[in-house]
């Protein structure tokens, strides 16, 4: 993480005096000294603090030192506050690091809050710290915390539809820091807050403890959370196995946040928490019981920066502290301390740049809220309580033969979403258990009465079951007969004689209007050329009076096996708005072809490569959403997967709805190109690495390959630079495919400009083209992801407008085809003139005969100007000369304002009125747009020459004001789009009270411009305005180039 330039000095507690004139920063550390069982022990965290200080030293030209005040081994709630008080009294630190234990952290946090001193820790997981009241207002947790674990558990319950109850078991010896109690506390509070019935019990480490635990489980819940040492879990599971609680009706979540149970130990191998030094029968029972266990751990950051950090951490721990640390999730805490220190330095720098000081601890802590940045532990996201969002992993017995536990899901705390790896959870009964099965807990329910049935009831029940079985059997037989009849009827078959071919331009004319988005060149379906880069038109024809797309199949004949017949039936059955409709197939040799719905706008690749089409992000998100919907439906259908998804296989119909084509009918597909041809490799740019290797894949694997292809298409849509764009590299498709197939780290993927794209969109791309198929999301998850950051959603205005224009143009072509060209030309001129007089949206409403409703705008900026001395000039000139002068001047002005997001309202004589912020709202950009336009007009006037008086200087007087207005159309004859409100009057007063060749702005406009900090303004003073009284006004002098200066 790059830090802005700032002079820092970290003064040592044993270093003596701060250098005169230097701005020193003192860090104080309060952490356990020797006890390595704590993830936040000083020998574990100290190397990370040293590495953070060195990182600051590399980024900043300063002398950096640090010291610590260690505690003696244990988490002492008495020694920790005493140490903190000593540090404050004798060294006055600017930042406290630690403690990690809950009780000491609570004591020290109260002191730090009183001192207004930032307290940064990656421990202190208790839920109570999330409430940043007066006691903990300066506490910042950059590590995991129990409430975030609770959020993950609530998300799990929502996924599995567990909404009734849960049971919690934990070990609590009430000694030291009670880690199990505070960990499960977050789960308890989160589930209780979700209106679940949650019961908890402390596990008794005594004879009879396992029996008490299973009795508690039977009475209180099928979803069980256990937090304690692994030995405790083994004892409970062995008793549960004896009582048949591991039959699939219960699921046991083991909260092992540091994953110690999954690490190799003296009696177990890696990923096998069920192994223990027990008898053979007990070991087998444990292995079977662990099929019902899911382990929850923190997620180790997958980024290479963390791996490098961990290697350096282990080396520094050995060299500086003499301890041997191994790879462990406990090292994540050290990384969180590292990121926390760099985050503090970044925020402190911003605070000083804004005029604050390092003593302003509350301000520094407040600036950390809601911050996002990339650290060594990955993406660091702080919530509004200054607690870091935490990622978790859900582990399950992924391999029943070996018993190895593998990741089943990853949870992203920043996105509040679970990403399933694709490895199924081995539910004993094939599905997750119910958390509230009938008659399990509510025994008072009358339906739970187990009184034996009478003989008459048994006979009636048997008769009913017999009739039901007879009805079901009859239905199945009937369905089977209908299926065979449908297969034999071959409703899909099209004779070659039924397809009519003719002038393609005639089809093109009947396919829809070409007036929208300059799409004449993309009016046919598209195929890739032999070079694999550009598109050519697909074959089209007529079938039963409709234009259809015809795809020829390079096969001599098709054998109608039962499998082929089923493929063709499935193609007829699968119909969806975002899939091209399968019309039929022709199998008459040699004219074998597939006939599908015709989409006149061409392929998605055509549209993306057509530079004349301006695709805004709302339109792009609409195309992406259509593609995701189509693939989600396809994956859930009988066809199951596409297998060859690419942008050229996504076509757009006349209403700009994207549809997927070339799916299904595997028996018809063939590759015509040679194995080493350029076109073949160009088509493989969208192909997943596992398919490039040539190994056959199961259905789920093909679906994950489709997700990879979608990721490449997503990059095409975002950058519009072609498939697999590589910045600065000129590689052939064959070279690209070979690099992807090799799979060497770092994996070869397209280039992404993170500065220009939505961060969540970039993250989705990277997950879709992950090397491991299990890491890729499915289209159901992608649909939810797209829905979150495409908040516009729904049918767009553009889509509705295009649909109406298409329908209107088609009707005209059919009714008056001979006069269409002349009519359209006159219509185009009339519309162009109308759009110059009125805003486009208003003109469309008037064209439809609708009443234009007045619209209120909360904030716009209005520009008024006139010519000083125009009356005298007019008196000395002929009327024709005056008209020529105004025409020259306003033609110049009109050309200039086209470069800005403004709307010209009217010109009356020498008065010129312009507004920004309506009719299209542009957020807060209206004030700077008008300011830049005014400066440009003032600059143009200086060089403007009057034809009949070339030696006279034209003097323009400008007034600008910002405020609310109401806009609407006035009158029926020669309607005008007018603005109303006091803002218009005030803007006029600003102009009339201004001075020649100056820009007179109000205080509200000045405030709006000050938010950018790049405009030069000068106070004019209080000016008496007619009807307004005194108003404070300013002169706009110009705009500074470049960003505001840094401290």
Swiss-Prot record:
Compartments, record wording: Cell membrane
Record's bilayer topology term: Single-pass type I membrane protein
EC number, UniProt record: 4.6.1.2
InterPro entries cross-referenced by the UniProt entry: A/G_cyclase (IPR001054), A/G_cyclase_CS (IPR018297), ANF_lig-bd_rcpt (IPR001828), ANPR/GUC (IPR001170), Cyclic_nucleotide_synthase (IPR050401), Kinase-like_dom_sf (IPR011009), Nucleotide_cyclase (IPR029787), Peripla_BP_I (IPR028082)
Effect of residue 658 to F: In AMD1; no effect on subcellular location; changed glycosylation; no effect on C-type natriuretic peptide binding; decreased guanylate cyclase activity; loss of natriuretic peptide receptor activity; dominant negative effect
Summary of the function given for this chain in its UniProt record: Receptor for the C-type natriuretic peptide NPPC/CNP hormone. Has guanylate cyclase activity upon binding of its ligand. May play a role in the regulation of skeletal growth.
Family stated for the protein in its record: Belongs to the adenylyl cyclase class-4/guanylyl cyclase family.
Stated name of the protein: Atrial natriuretic peptide receptor 2
Species the sequence originates in: Homo sapiens
Lineage: Eukaryota, Metazoa, Chordata, Craniata, Vertebrata
